[in-house]
Amino acid sequence: MGRIIAVANQKGGVGKSTTAINLSACLAEKGKKVLAIDIDPQGNTTSGFGVEKNELENTVYELILGECSVEECLIKNVVKNVSIIPSNVNLAAAEIELIGVDKKEYILKNEIDWIRDQYDFIIIDCPPSLSMLTINAMTTADTVLVPIQCEYYALEGLSQLIHTVNLVRERLNPTLDIEGIVFTMYLSLIHISEPTRR
């Protein structure tokens, strides 16, 4: 059964997509079969793998709304050993579309469970918010990997994210854990990075 890792931080510009892309590529280079799922409406992971996001007929948005199957939105082998469920700006409407939907926190999990065994790793790139999309990713995932920029104010957001992970664990996904923290944009020449790292 494939290990599912959600790459999440509600703060934007901290390197979530870069982390998701590079983690997927490194695992693929080691011979692992990887599925990248882009659930960020910005679609940076989609673009990062060379997919033209504005020309897609089926994306994770259509998958979440039940308008297509996983197989219909899956793009296989965008690079060797990496397939992707892409995203684009249409996904921004998902929050509104999901209002009133029963068990909406489990939509992504229910779809991904069908193909989980086909991959060694599934990497989910989350949007820069603690939205229903991020909750879906955490409900689906085994662990959460947190990219954090090496600056003082990043720590404020980290405590909020940990609180959200704990809530999801209590109410939706009892096995969810934090995989770890990845320091991004670290510069040893800047004095604030070292105290933040400690």
What are these regions, as identified by a protein language model?
Residues M1-R198:
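P-loop NTP-binding core
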